[in-house]
């Protein structure tokens, strides 16, 4: 895989490779697409996805992003009960254009700032709106 390559995910979306170090999200995106295709109503993924997570939240907290507020809140409460530090993070729609590509459906990274959030927005592209999804970035 090289910068400029175009890959196709299992759900048919095309992805322009900008950064070859952002390969984990490609694999996770396919897993999410397959979980949706299999009809799962709730999907929680856990990944050491971005170094930007540690920059945003430090070494002790993991970030939780979701397309469903109540499901994310339930996961955060469960983490608290287990003694884990989990912090709710947004999926800001105004950052989604950072993933736009002129040659594919989206790029595999969104730019130099907000890396944890754009990674979450990237993954959200592979989950249907009716699937309750929570992404935990535990880097």
Describe the residue ranges of each PLM region.
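A generic structural signal for tightly packed, nonpolar segments enriched in small/aliphatic residues
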Residues: 1-139
